[in-house]
Amino acid sequence: MKSLKITALSLVLVLLLAACGAKNDTPDEPAVDPTPEPPIEQPVEKTPDERINDIIAGMSIEEKVGQLFFVRCPETGAVEDVETYHLGGLLLFGRDYKDANGDWLTEDDFTAALASYQDAAAIPLFIGSDEEGGTVTRASKNPNLFSEPLPSPQELYAAGGLDGLLERTLSYNQKLKAFGVNVNFAPVCDVSTNPDNFIYARSFGQDAQTTADYISSVVPVYAQSGVACVLKHFPGYGNNADTHTGIALDARPYTTFEKSDLVPFESGIAAGAPFVLVSHNIVECMDGAYPASLSAKVHTLLRDTLGFTGVIVTDDLAMDAVKAYAQDGCAAVLAIQAGNDMIVTTDYQTQIPQVIAAVQSGEIAESDIDAHVFRVLHEKQALGLID
């Protein structure tokens, strides 16, 4: 019996040893590394130009063409027309600072009106005003907005020198910005020293270089205020007639423009001015066949010779000088073909469909429209209106 127990115990020990041996003979399984997490792709931030191109790619022809119109604010229906015509900008005149009864708008009412226009726009608007000072003022005539109308540059310069002029320009434009105005159709770059000239009272009243020095100093002041400025009236009025009432022929030689009229524009462009407005003068040494606003040659001069890369805008196409010239009523089509980026006009309800039709027919290439829209949106981006 004792022998059986010993035998059984020995068998158990043998089995245990065999099991241990079997376990030790099994090779170790290799360690498995944890599956690495896929790298998180960081979104590539697009450049400002790429963001603009994305916007343009998503726009219809109607939306693109609408962006090229900086129209006189209609007396009624402005909110509806901003949405219907996809307008790029509204230009305010004296009546737009008054209510339906002819009373001056309060600050709150004026600010609310501009905000309502912006609310109607899929792409934020340029909202412009002519606030040159002196004989051409809009906003500052409203005593609810400003304590006094803005004096002319000549008056401000005579009273306080260049520093005084720049200080007043800054303060007035900062107020415009606070109300919702983001483009001022100023300063006047025309060179005029003759009080009998049409443009004299609106000009700086000094020679070309002194005017150029003023322009190069005042352009950064507009930028500081957050309001874009508009150099006007390219290529310079000189002693010409008023194109609001008819065609003005300028027979001066090109050397005169080189030494005088173009000098302030060159200074303003070098200082970073975002807009240049082209006049309706027929400048024979540049293009004797077309008003400057409708002349491809004048626009080539502005782009290629003066190196301007910003927004070119027409003077008001409702002026008699262009009405008489564009007898078929397609002034906006001619203006865009000439190289303008934006059209200032009152009859946009007629002109916009004509431009759309010209694009659809191939008379105006859509690629040209895209280039104009790009410059418009680039400036809206610079003003912080779009990302």
Regions found by a protein language model. Give the residues of each.
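Phosphate/pyrophosphate-binding betaalpha-module
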Residues: 214-233, 260-273
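Bacterial N-terminal signal peptides that target proteins for export
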Residues: 1-8
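Alpha-helix-loop-beta-strand connector modules within alpha/beta enzyme cores
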Residues: 117-123, 206-227, 292-313
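Preference for extracellular/luminal or secreted protein segments
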Residues: 21-81, 305, 324-387
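Enzymes and membrane/adaptor proteins characterized by extended Gly/Ser/Thr/Asp/Glu-rich
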Residues: 81-211, 233, 238-251, 279-294, ...
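Short, well-ordered coil/turn segments that N-cap beta-strands
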Residues: 67, 88, 122-126, 181-182, ...
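C-terminal motif of bacterial Sec signal peptides marking the signal peptidase cleavage site
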Residues: 16-19
